[in-house]
Amino acid sequence: MSVIKMTDLDLAGKRVLIRADLNVPVKDGKVTSDARIRASLPTIETALKQGAKVMVTSHLGRPTEGEYNEEFSLLPVVNYLKDKLSAPVRLAKDYLDGVEIAAGELVVLENVRFNKGEKKDDETLSKKYAALCDVYVMDAFGTAHRAQASTHGVGKFAPIACAGPLLSAELEALGKALGNPARPMVAIVGGSKVSTKLTVLGALSKIADQLIVGGGIANTFVAAQGNNVGKSLYEADLIPEAKRLLETCDIPVPTDVRVATEFSETATATLKPANQIKDDEQILDLGDESAERLAEILKNAKTILWNGPVGVFEFPNFRKGTEIVARAIAESEAFSIAGGGDTLAAIDLFGIADQISYISTGGGAFLEFVEGKKLPAVVMLEERAKQ
C-alpha cells in the first residue's frame, strides 16, 4: 500500500489542512472523552513544530447538513486544544473563501457537516477545501470508509495529498495482522448480530488459523448444533450459514454458558451446559469452561485480531467470559489488534490498553478493511501517490 506520508514531507511555511477525527462526546460545552483528540495531537504538533500554517477540521455528531448548529460546534474541541498546546488556537466559522493564518498558529475549521455537499462528496465544496491548503493530510481512519468532501474529494484536488501518522500507523497495523500475519493467527468476532458480521467472518475464515465467535453471534452457532437457545438473541435464518462455517472452519462453540430469565443488570446468572437451556432462559455470557478453552487457544497465538465482546460485559454478573478472554489477549505474546466501540469499552473496563499491541480507532472502517473492501480515502491517497 503505497501512499505519501506526512512525515516524509517538509511542511515549513506550507498551509497544511489536517482532516482529523475529532468526533468526541460533548456535554454542557465540555469534551467528556478525549481519546480521539489525544490520538490526533502528535500529528498537529508535528506540523506546528515544522513551522507550518496548520488548519485542522473534523465532523462532530450528526447535524442537519448545511446548517450551523451550536450544539455540534467544534468550540469545545478548540477549548480543549488551547489547554494542551502552546501554540495559539482559534476557531474559524466561515472559511470556504479563504483563511488568514500565521506560521505556528492552529486554526480549527468549524464542523465540516455545516457545509452543504459534505456527505455527498460534492466537487465544488471539495475544490474549496483544496484551495485552502498546499498539503492535505488525511488522518481520520474512522471515516476513511466514507467518500465525503473532507475525507476524499479534497484529496483529489489539493496540490499534495498524504496520509497522517495516525492513518499510516493504522494501515500498517492492519496490514501486519491481515496481510502477512505471524502464525497461528486467531480472530475473535463477538457482538450481537451475525448478519452485520457475516462477511467479516467469511473473510477471516480464509486468513485466520482459528476463528472464535462470541456474544449473540455464538448463540446462532449454539442453535446450529441443534440446541435450544430459549429467549437468547440469535438469528434463525442464518443457521445454514453458521453450519457451513462450522463445516469449513474449526470454530469452538460454547459448551457451557451463563443464562438469565431476564435481560437486566441485576439478573441472576446461572451457569449450565449449553445443551440444557430452557425456553424462558437467555444466554448472556460464556461459561468458565468455554472461556478457559478460548484463553488456552489465545495463549499459543502469534497474531490476534479482536472485534467484539463475548458476553454482555456491561452487566457485572455476565462479565466474566469477556474478562477471561480480554486478559488472555493482554497476557499473550502475540501481536494483538483490537477494534470496534464495544471492544474498546471492554479494554477500558479491564484496564488492559497498554497490553494490546494496537487499538484501532475505526469502527466501520476497521470492519470494512478486515472484509477486504477498499476504503475510498485510502484509494484516493494511493492514486495521488502515483501521480
UniProtKB/Swiss-Prot annotation:
- Entry's Gene Ontology BP terms: gluconeogenesis; glycolytic process
Top EC class for this record = transferase
Gene3D superfamilies per record: Phosphoglycerate kinase, N-terminal domain
Q: For this protein, what reaction is catalysed?
A: (2R)-3-phosphoglycerate + ATP = (2R)-3-phospho-glyceroyl phosphate + ADP
Asked whether the UniProt record includes Cytoplasm among its keywords, one would answer yes
Recorded hits in SUPFAM superfamilies, A to Z, give: Phosphoglycerate kinase (SSF53748)
Binding, substrate = D21, L22, N23, R36, H59, L60, G61, R62, R113, R146
Q: One GO CC annotation, please? A: cytosol
Alphabetically list the UniProt keywords: ATP-binding, Cytoplasm, Glycolysis, Kinase, Nucleotide-binding, Transferase
Q: Which Pfam families match?
A: PGK
The pathway that the record names for this protein is:
Carbohydrate degradation; glycolysis; pyruvate from D-glyceraldehyde 3-phosphate: step 2/5
GO molecular function annotations of the record: ADP binding; ATP binding; phosphoglycerate kinase activity
Family, similarity comment:
Belongs to the phosphoglycerate kinase family.
This chain belongs to the protein called: Phosphoglycerate kinase
